[in-house]
C-alpha cells in the first residue's frame, strides 16, 4: 500500500522520474518558463523551489548540492549570483503554475510553469 506517499509517480520508474525532473528543473531555471503537463509542472515546482532556497543560502555546501542536481554548472553559478537579489524577500513560492489549453493529441491537461 502506498499510504501517505507524496512523490508523484508520473508513470515512470524512479531513475527515469528523477532524470525527467532534473532536466525540467534545469530548463525552467535556464529559460524562465516552460510548457509541460500539469502533473509534471506540479512535480517540478517543489524541486525548483528547493534549488532556489539553496541558492539564497549561498554556502559552499548548498552550491555543491545544487551542482549535484542541476545539469549545467554555469547555470548554477548564475543562479547563485542573482538569487539573493531576485528572491531575497520571498520565503518560498518562487514558481507559478498557470493552466493552459489541453494538448491536441491526447487531451492531456497542460500548464505553463514560470519563475516569479
Swiss-Prot record:
Keywords: Ribonucleoprotein, Ribosomal protein. InterPro entries: Ribosomal_bL17 (IPR000456), Ribosomal_bL17_CS (IPR047859), Ribosomal_bL17_sf (IPR036373). Gene3D superfamilies: Ribosomal protein L17 (3.90.1030.10). GO terms for cellular component: cytosolic large ribosomal subunit. It comes from the Bacteria. GO terms for molecular function: structural constituent of ribosome. Transmembrane segments: none annotated. PROSITE patterns: RIBOSOMAL_L17. GO terms for biological process: translation. Part of the 50S ribosomal subunit. Contacts protein L32. Belongs to the bacterial ribosomal protein bL17 family. NCBIfam families: L17. This is Large ribosomal subunit protein bL17. It comes from Microcystis aeruginosa (strain NIES-843 / IAM M-2473). The gene is rplQ.
Amino acid at each position: 500500500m502506498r499510504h501517505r506517499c507524496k512523490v508523484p509517480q508520473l508513470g515512470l520508474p524512479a531513475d527515469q522520474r528523477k532524470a525527467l525532473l532534473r532536466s525540467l528543473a534545469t530548463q525552467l531555471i535556464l529559460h524562465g518558463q516552460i510548457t509541460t503537463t500539469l502533473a509534471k509542472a506540479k512535480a517540478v515546482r517543489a524541486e525548483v523551489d528547493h534549488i532556489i532556497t539553496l541558492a539564497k543560502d549561498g554556502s559552499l555546501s548548498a552550491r555543491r548540492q545544487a551542482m549535484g542536481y542541476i545539469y549545467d554548472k554555469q547555470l548554477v553559478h548564475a543562479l547563485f549570483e542573482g538569487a539573493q537579489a531576485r528572491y531575497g524577500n520571498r520565503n518560498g513560492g518562487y514558481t507559478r503554475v498557470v493552466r493552459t489549453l489541453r494538448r491536441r493529441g491526447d487531451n492531456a491537461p497542460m500548464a505553463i510553469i514560470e519563475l516569479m
